[in-house]
Design a protein with these regions (language model features):
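General beta-strand structural signal in soluble alpha/beta enzymes
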Residues: 9, 55-56, 78-81, 110, ...
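Short beta-strands and strand-loop turn motifs
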Residues: 49, 78-82, 160
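Helix-rich "cap/lid" substructures immediately adjacent to catalytic or cofactor-binding pockets
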Residues: 1-6
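N-terminal small/polar loop signature for handling phosphorylated ligands or for N-terminal nucleophile
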Residues: 68-71, 97-99
Length: 176
């Protein structure tokens, strides 16, 4: 039933392309809501997989709200880009690739937006090598993870202004 109605997500690029690719591979419709400032190369790459791309809002959070609205109105299955344990586990396979390519790696630096990527990477990296140090890196003007850690709970920033569009998230996920 999900396949017939289609998938929807909000993303500034990488997750968008992943969902679009998977939908094409499994023969279902994908609608991707991206912030209006998303680089054209990411928009075009997402479209190249057959997804319907909707540009909406200034930042990820605006696109997310609109994607949720469309999901509810149309019965689409929403695939969250970071606040989903299965998605985070998939993103964690990056750690496996890093360790295979660099067996003596001591540190892995991970960009932090919503927190899913660092949750997945740190989980798998630590399973493969408990001594690996994982360092999260986030923009000063979109430091939602830092704010959450300082507050001891998820908080929403007033804004998330950064050129690093994949990390421009006002609040980290509460599941990862």
């Amino acid at each position: 039933e999900d396949r017939n109605k289609g998938l929807i997500t909000a993303s500034a690029g990488n997750h968008a392309q992943g969902v679009a690719y998977a939908a094409k591979r499994y023969g279902c419709k994908a609608t991707i809501v991206m912030p209006t400032g998303t680089p054209l190369i990411k928009v075009n790459r997402t479209k190249s997989y057959g997804a319907d791309v909707v540009l909406y809002g200034d930042v990820y959070d605006d696109a997310y709200d609109y994607a949720c609205k469309l999901a509810e109105e149309n019965g689409y299955t929403f695939v969250h880009p970071f606040n989903d344990l299965d998605v985070s586990a998939g993103q964690g396979t990056i750690a496996m690739e890093i360790v295979q390519e660099l067996p003596t790696v001591d540190y892995i630096l991970v960009p932090v937006g919503g927190g899913g990527l660092i949750a997945g990477v740190s989980t798998l990296a630590k399973m493969l090598n408990p001594k690996i140090r994982i360092i999260g890196v986030e923009p000063a003007e979109a430091a939602s993870m830092t704010a959450a850690l300082q507050a001891g709970e998820v908080v929403e920033l007033d804004s998330a202004n950064t050129i690093a569009d994949g990390t421009a998230v006002k609040a980290v996920g509460d599941k990862v």
